[in-house]
Amino acid sequence: MTTQAAEVAKRRTFAIISHPDAGKTTITEKLLLMGQAIAVAGTVKSRKSDRHATSDWMEMEKQRGISITTSVMQFPYREHMINLLDTPGHEDFSEDTYRTLTAVDSALMVLDGGKGVEPRTIALMDVCRLRDTPIVSFINKLDRDIRDPIELLDEIEAVLKIKAAPITWPIGSYKDFKGVYHLAADRIFVYVPGHGHERIEVPVIQGLDSAEAREHLGDLYDGFVEQLELVKGACHEFDRDAFLEGEMTPVFFGTALGNFGVDQVLDCIVDWAPQPLSRAAHERVVEPTEEKFTGFVFKIQANMDPKHRDRIAFLRICSGRYEKGMKMRHVRIKKDLKIADALTFFSSEREMLEEAWAGDIIGLHNHGTIQIGDTFSEGEILGFTGIPHFAPELFRRVRLKDPLKSKQLRQGLQELAEEGATQVFFPERSNDIILGAVGVLQFDVVASRLKEEYKVECAYEAVNVWSARWIECDDKKKLEDFKVKAFENIAIDGGGHLTYLAPTRVNLSLMEERWPEVKFRATREHH
């Protein structure tokens, strides 16, 4: 095996997806603890806690105890290199979350055992389904009251349309939580409370029919054996091929807060999740083991370092190797760059990088020329596909408090839009500026960042827009007719693309009916 193939085989790049408060930040920290990337898990005990989660770094996140931006963390585990992409998990997140899922090879879904499948999880699973991303499931909070585990598995199957195969099964819950039983290995992992902040060797009992198992389970033993028979009869057996095709999810149980069950999840990602996969470009399919370097930008982050007004482009390497000082071609602007200062991430800790391989995420310093969806190569003209803009779900009109600052406002919004913090629309019929977002909090984030970073104060007003659609039409005359007739609702987005701002769902349906030659797109590829 070549060095290149060996390095690719070692990589696992995945994201964590969950509904707010399902325990995603806690499991992130415990995964880092497993990889010994942090010495002690600084758990976020409450939203007012002074100890901030390692992966929450922007000012607003510190105040609210939520991870707004997508952090990237790399750590070694069992002779593999793990790239973990943390995604915003609070009520209102952004397109960033959706786009992060285009840069990974698998995902870990965290569910609250007391609540089951929640709305945000459904939305994220829809995005995973676009690329048939393999999903590992972790049912969390076993140290509290949870719903019936069989019911939870049924819900995963019914709501998320994916087969659920339990790998471990919980023994009791809340005050009676004794641990989990590994079905295939016939082994009990014993839960020892009080070790949430450290790695311990989990006691293991081999064989459910052993005297030790009977003693540990006590009064729960007979009921558990009975339940297990039911589980084995009713549930799917794990099939790795079905998992790799995105049709089946292996399910684990545990408590992230108690640091229990997380190591089994990480072992599953190493043993079963795919190494970096091939990637489609407009021109051809790129294999990760190819020698030449290629990669695409899926996120831009401003201000990672309060000391510098910098912007970092997050790039997923698709093939080849990054070496410090190498020449790269920025395909969209047809420019060759010498990159000597790429970064690797550990949340807000940043280190200069000597080398990186397919599957890794690196940071490039960006002085305003790099945009989301940009491809970098060693000279080949390539454009990777599948990094879309998603139609916003919420809209606000921007009002400037100081009219003399309109230039700074436009510059700030342009930069924040390129970074994916918001989408900007300029209606043809007025001088208004309309912002679009996927969650309400994005508007707060934009306002506070305009104030902090661009010294611009703005307010928002309600606007009569239900949704946005990007317009395409092969017939130029029809397109011109459409623009005249629909003038009241036509806008240009921040990237210069023609957009229709529909005031209502009914209006959009009528327009689609009246103009069959015009395509109203809910997503737009980055070009």
Swiss-Prot record:
- Which residue ranges run through the membrane? none
Q: Does the keyword Disulfide bond apply?
A: no
Q: Which Gene3D superfamilies match?
A: P-loop containing nucleotide triphosphate hydrolases, Peptide chain release factor 3, domain III
> What UniProt keywords apply to this chain's record, in alphabetical order?
Cytoplasm, GTP-binding, Nucleotide-binding, Protein biosynthesis
As for subcellular location, the record says: Cytoplasm
Superkingdom classification of source? Bacteria
Q: Which GO terms describe its molecular function?
A: GTP binding; GTPase activity; guanosine tetraphosphate binding; translation release factor activity, codon nonspecific; translation release factor activity, codon specific
Enumerate the Gene Ontology biological process terms. Answer: regulation of translational termination
Name the residues that bind GTP: 18-25, 86-90, 140-143
Q: Pfam families under this entry?
A: EF-G_D2, GTP_EFTU, RF3_C
Q: Which residues form the tr-type G domain?
A: 9-277
Give the UniProt entry's GO cellular component terms: cytosol
**Record has Nucleotide-binding as a keyword:** yes
Function of the molecule: Increases the formation of ribosomal termination complexes and stimulates activities of RF-1 and RF-2. It binds guanine nucleotides and has strong preference for UGA stop codons. It may interact directly with the ribosome. The stimulation of RF-1 and RF-2 is significantly reduced by GTP and GDP, but not by GMP.
The record's listing under HAMAP family reads:
Rel_fac_3
The family annotation for this protein states:
Belongs to the TRAFAC class translation factor GTPase superfamily. Classic translation factor GTPase family. PrfC subfamily.
What is this protein's name?
Answer: Peptide chain release factor 3
Q: What is the lineage of its organism?
A: Bacteria, Pseudomonadati, Pseudomonadota, Gammaproteobacteria, Pseudomonadales
